[in-house]
């Protein structure tokens, strides 16, 4: 009536992007009995957590991703789709051939000064922090006021200058709000109870999440908006 055309759409939902958010929404919608179409402008699924096999190694194409959470329900949910290894992120900084544990913890301080108790480490840091009096005028002074000169010179300065492309004395103090210091022998980067990387890579995990769901790759939603909006 009234000249209106009723068009039955092919899908209940159109999901743009096949990263974790889009893939999990699509999975849950399908589980609830809805029909879903997923489109992604990239030639692969999994968004920024995409991994691909090179020489038998799962390479993280868009930077390293380590899954970590304290939420048991989240962990139980995600492990339906992949078995996770027990990878624990324990970074090490190389300063002129000396290896230092990151984030700053008792292993770092022991290597730096030979201290063995939290009290000794705290006293050393406090003593060095006193070098800066008054309001820090630049990033160098800010870092020294937080962790002292030794840690700044060996573990903050070079990395920060490489990151910003300029001298720490030329960078504003507000860039570094705080530098976490742990007075424990703990070099676990995350404090999360559950952490790891899916065996077989993230792409395989997202494939499992999207099982039975139609996915169109190399499809930019903005370029095909009208056609895709007519479908869902």
Please report, for each region that a protein language model flagged, where it lies by residue:
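Short, Lys/Arg-enriched N-terminal segments with co-localized hydrophobic residues
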Residues: 1-9
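Active-site/ligand-binding neighborhood in enzyme catalytic cores
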Residues: 93-100, 106-231
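N-terminal Rossmann-like dinucleotide/flavin-binding domain of flavoprotein oxidoreductases
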Residues: 68-72, 76-80, 203-213
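N-terminal glycine-rich dinucleotide-binding loop that anchors FAD/FMN and/or NAD(P) in oxidoreductases
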Residues: 52-77
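A short alpha-helix-loop-beta-strand transition element characteristic
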Residues: 74-96, 151-154
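Conserved beta-strand segments of alpha/beta enzyme cores
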Residues: 35, 58, 83, 214-216
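Glycine-rich FAD pyrophosphate-binding loop
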Residues: 30-55
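N-terminal Rossmann-like FAD-binding beta1-loop-alpha1 element of flavoenzymes
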Residues: 11-38
């Amino acid at each position: 009536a009234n000249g209106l055309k009723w068009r039955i759409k092919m899908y209940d939902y159109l999901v743009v992007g096949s990263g974790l958010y889009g893939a999990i929404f699509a999975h849950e919608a399908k589980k609830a009995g809805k029909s879903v179409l997923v489109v992604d402008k990239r030639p692969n699924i999994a968004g920024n957590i995409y991994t691909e096999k090179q020489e038998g190694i799962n390479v993280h194409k868009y930077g390293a991703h380590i899954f970590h959470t304290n939420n048991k329900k989240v962990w139980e949910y995600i492990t339906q789709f992949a078995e996770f290894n027990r990878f624990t992120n324990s970074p090490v900084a190389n300063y002129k051939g000396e290896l230092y544990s990151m984030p700053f913890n008792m292993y770092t301080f022991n290597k730096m000064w030979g201290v063995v108790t939290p009290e000794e480490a705290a006293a050393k840091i406090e003593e060095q922090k006193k070098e800066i009096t008054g309001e820090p005028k630049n990033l160098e002074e800010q870092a020294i006021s937080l962790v002292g000169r030794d840690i700044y010179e060996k573990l903050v300065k070079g990395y920060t200058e490489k990151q910003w492309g300029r001298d720490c004395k030329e960078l504003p103090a507000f860039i570094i709000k705080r530098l976490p210091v742990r007075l424990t022998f703990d070099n676990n980067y995350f404090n999360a109870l559950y952490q790891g990387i899916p065996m077989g890579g993230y792409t395989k995990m997202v494939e499992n999440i999207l099982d039975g769901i139609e996915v169109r790759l190399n499809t930019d939603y903005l370029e095909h908006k009208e056609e895709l909006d007519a479908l869902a």
